[in-house]
């Protein structure tokens, strides 16, 4: 703790000193202009006025720097006194610490099956010691929604997160639902970042009474909110380009040059000795047209595919073994007169006779983050000093590279487990430091591997027709066994004064068939295309909004083109609005896939009926509860329209949870007996507050599980 606090103080002084330097320079420039405007005796007065202002600024800066450590010390003492007062008043309570292990997407059906087979001894032991229950997820059953409810104890209508993205009502284009990032308005200004999630997380409320928390990679915590504790953000943290993850693929094969979803392909020339190309970073607003910044790199090729290549980039040299990820490589991109730092990994796929190399999305460098990815700001830097560099991208496992067959199965697994081991190192480092308070960490490994490898659980899954390597039939079973080993390590560090909670935000099911909601709406005259158009590209490019009553966007919802809400809305609020929702619900509930002879949609949920809250209107009007095996189509999710309603899902992304919430509950384990008859995601936050003897805020919709 001493090293960490010292680091905070030193970095604060450095940051403030830089700010004062810039302020002084800018002030001197302003005053210089005023002085230059005077001719004759007045110039001397103007000069001395400027001199005294600069002198006063210098002494003010000196005083602030001298007193800064005292201010930090006073704040630390105040927090310590508040912290000690709380635990003195509650010394009789059993719970001193709450540890939360989040395993995104851990499925109850698989968990129960593997426990019965004796494959998960630590989960079985935790169940016997305390409790196990299925955990009711949110509607819709999507990670940003569920984890927001976990943090706040609120339903979506009160925390305002209904999906990964929503629509801009003025343009019908997609926008991130959880964060608003605006580009700098000038060369000296930084991007403006604003969280769109409403409500307060339980760790913020605990911090009010001096109870500190360490929160690692809980989704939808970007940008980080100030509170009494430490936090590393996760889902929705962008890459250095400002996207949610853009990989690069370099190839000498013309046949591999394709338009890749989630990445960019670059042609290189293999002359047998070296490959030369560029890495592309953030836009440079100082140049005309704001082109992407770029830095050169070279790969010195080996004589055979089994030898190491040499990577030369940013004055650094790395040996690249074939099909083995490089360590994190630090990059510096020139943007104007500044440098912006990122990190990435390189993976040589082939060198002879053709060259192929994959590069991960360029993550924000945790040692020098261009955006706030942690609280305090220096916490990300501190972790990088403790454990070297690490993934900072919110969605760090590159599912699209596997979908596009740039990576093979092993390449994806290697990347995923590299990220997982980083997370384990962070988690256990923080766990050893947090003796009282909360330590929570969410692992994405369970979610990502099930998404991409579910097809191996089903011999007849349509995705097998699109390729993929054999031999991965046990991948998901091994995943669950690895999580059991993680739990075993964790349980050895849990004492009698620690409440241990292990949970997932949702379960998993097969994704075999795609449902194009927009095509169904088009074929049934709820969505209308422009004159002469038979289909539409992404983001409703050919949609005639003056005649469209309903449209689908995102992973789970249908929006009504409501007059007075959407920019070109035509459906009247009130009776017409309610009648249209009822009509769509009746026609889509029980919708049958005639080619397969099964129901594709179990139920349609009217948001205004299932939720009560001030932000109901920010979500979709109707949430679609898909049957097992079905999900919204890839095209429909991004606003495309064609004439096909049902089609096979051929992508490696073969498992999903964006279904009827009733069939994809999560799991809940804890080392104490539950008193509640059932458990919901919204119950976790109030449960943690009650364990520390705090009153649950009236705004929270969840209930404590041990009361």
Q: For each predicted feature, which ranges?
A:
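Active-site regions of oxyanion-processing enzymes, predominantly non-cytosolic
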Residues: 214, 419-453, 624
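Secreted, luminal/periplasmic, and some membrane-associated catalytic domains
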Residues: 93-96, 103, 109, 118, ...
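Hydrophobic alpha-helical membrane-interaction elements
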Residues: 36-65
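N-terminal secretory/membrane targeting signals
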Residues: 1-37
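A solvent-exposed, charged loop/short amphipathic helix patch at secondary-structure junctions
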Residues: 455-474, 642-649
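N-terminal signal-anchor transmembrane helix
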Residues: 75-95
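Membrane-spanning helices that line or support transport/gating and their immediate boundary helices
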Residues: 61-77
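Low-complexity, glycine/alanine/valine/leucine- and proline-rich hydrophobic stretches
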Residues: 628-683
